[in-house]
A protein has these predicted regions:
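Short, Lys/Arg-rich, polar N-terminal cytosolic tail immediately upstream
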Residues: 2-32
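Membrane-proximal helix-loop-helix interfaces that form the catalytic/acceptor-binding platform
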Residues: 3, 28, 32-531
Length: 531
């Protein structure tokens, strides 16, 4: 049995109208759905125009991507631990990419970007305003979201954005018509979604809380029991996934890395200042550069949803933000980092698009052309405003791939290869020989090693003592070779700290070293000859 959650907004047709006398034939009733599907697919495919796909498929992985990419070269049993807190199911998807060059793994986040854009269109469809116009506006909001346009890297953040939009769709559908299976769908996406994202539960809890608020506002008290049961199931499944898969991979090193993004708890004034500063810093990636414009756009969207009697949708983003802030204060999730904020930043332009569509719908009572004109005017502002992010190249320029290619084509018998700590993860992905990943002091609890290759020296850390010991070991390997067959020492480096650079300069000062420029970090060829 189903019950309507809200009275229809003025533009909605009464359910079952198609069965009344004079209704259109069944075949013609399918055309709007077919058009919706085609438009959703078109918006999704438009992602290929606003992202530089050739750049994504040829730009070398940098260190933060490389240790995720290494999961496809490791035994399948190491996939979860190597990926650290990267969602395990998302990480397994990397093994399924069937075509492309070495950087083909970025097709996974690209696919989720396309799904998010298509879902953006479908969200507009569920609002029951001006069907195609609203969908195009909300689809364009996701498609040209600066936060998503910046995300070409090998991370799960686009999947998190997709999950957020999907949860908004599910809440809208539940507002359209209350059905238990729709409520269960929200609980399932929010909990099982943790296998693909780290943030679905934040938005899911916000969705359930928002629906509870709507039930109170509309005095639908009996539905609160359904919400409580679905929420309990959602939290139980989420807790099980968190305890077994996520929490064990959270380390003190990771917590320390995100320390600047945790809300201070010692003073209310400091906390408020921190939150404002972080939000202001993210404003350019929310929609428009001035923070005030973004804030007014969000408030307009919330007001429009309240006018449409969609209290749950109106409350979702504010409650999501509140949850993230609380999680940050508890040192469980960073607040204010662009990458980890993508999942909620993408909702900001969506709310703006809803405000525009609602305004056009209201104006349509005066002039039927108003929704189209208002929508066109909004796109005329939105497209140029986000153009600076279109086809942007924001992946850090660390080209271990070129270094490995040069090394592989010039390596000779007797040579020794010395790989720096930070370069080792990309090296492990690109170098043809199969690496091993023993437990160590790496960002994911593993380091790179080549126990079957005696000519390989991989530094386990980046302290000066590690560089000194590694270079000494490489020299010993050269000295141990017969005088007539001694090779050279290849030094592969990337993502260096200032201390590393100074240490290398000191260690190699006055030594016979050739600098071979094949990328941002040149290959060093050390012609060491023992005395």
């Amino acid at each position: 049995m189903s019950v309507r959650a809200n009275p229809p907004v003025p533009s909605q047709r009464r359910r079952g109208a198609a069965s009344e006398p004079g209704a259109a034939p069944r075949g013609s009733r399918n055309w709007p759905l077919l058009i919706d599907i085609c438009l959703a697919v078109a918006v999704g495919l438009a992602v290929l125009l606003v992202h530089d796909v050739p750049y994504m498929l040829r730009h070398s992985f940098w260190v933060d991507e490389a240790w995720v990419a290494d999961t496809v070269r490791a035994p399948i049993g190491l996939t979860h631990s190597l990926g650290l807190i990267t969602p395990v199911a998302w990480t397994f998807l990397l093994r399924l990419v069937p075509f492309g060059g070495p950087e083909r793994l970025r097709l996974v986040p690209l696919a989720f970007t396309m799904l998010a854009a298509a879902a953006g269109y479908l969200l507009g469809r569920e609002l029951h305003l001006d069907r195609y116009i609203t969908g195009i506006l909300t689809g364009a909001a996701v498609l040209l979201s600066p936060a998503l346009l910046e995300r070409d890297d090998l991370k799960q953040y686009t999947a998190e954005a997709f999950a957020s939009v999907v949860l908004m769709i599910l809440v809208a559908r539940l507002e359209n018509e209350w059905k238990i299976r729709r409520l269960v769908a929200i609980a399932a996406v929010s909990s099982i979604g943790l296998l693909f994202t780290n943030t679905a539960i934040f938005v899911g809890v916000a969705a359930m809380a928002s629906l509870g608020l709507e039930c109170l506002v509309n005095r639908r008290y009996r539905r609160i029991l359904d919400l409580a049961a679905a929420s309990a199931g959602m939290l139980v499944v989420s807790l099980a996934i968190y305890v077994t898969l996520i929490r064990p991979e959270t380390s003190s090193k990771l917590t320390a890395y995100w320390d600047p993004f945790y809300v201070p708890t010692g003073s209310g004034a400091r906390a408020f200042h921190f939150i404002y500063r972080q939000l202001a810093g993210l404003a350019p990636y929310a929609g428009f550069r001035p923070f005030l414009v973004d804030a007014l756009g969000v408030l307009a969207g919330i007001a429009a949803l309240i006018w449409l009697r969609r209290v749950a949708l109106a409350a979702m983003l504010p409650i999501t933000l509140a949850i993230v802030i609380v999680a940050s204060a508890a040192r469980e999730y960073p607040f204010g980092d662009l990458r980890t904020s993508t999942f909620w930043l993408v909702l900001v332009p969506v709310l703006m698009a809803i405000a525009v569509s609602a305004a056009g719908h209201a104006a349509g009572r005066i002039d039927r052309r108003a929704p189209l004109l208002v929508g066109a005017a909004a796109l005329a502002i939105w497209v140029p405003a986000t153009n600076v992010y279109v086809r942007s190249h924001t992946i850090p320029n660390e080209d271990v791939h070129s270094q490995v290619t040069y090394l592989d084509s010039h390596f000779r018998r007797g040579d020794v290869v010395l790989v720096s700590y930070a370069a080792s993860y990309a090296f492990a992905y690109y170098y043809p020989a199969t690496p091993s990943f023993p437990v160590g002091d790496g960002p994911n609890g593993h380091v790179v090693a080549y126990p079957k290759l005696p000519y390989m020296v991989v530094l386990p850390q980046r302290q000066p003592s590690n560089l000194i010991d590694g270079l000494a070991e490489a020299r010993r390997k050269i000295a141990a070779e017969p005088p007539g067959s001694r090779g050279r020492i290849w030094i592969i480096r990337s993502h260096q700290t200032p201390t590393e650079i100074k240490t290398w300069d000191r260690l190699l000062a006055g030594q016979p070293v050739q600098v071979i420029r094949v990328g941002p970090d040149p290959v060093l060829l050390y012609l060491y000859r023992p005395r």
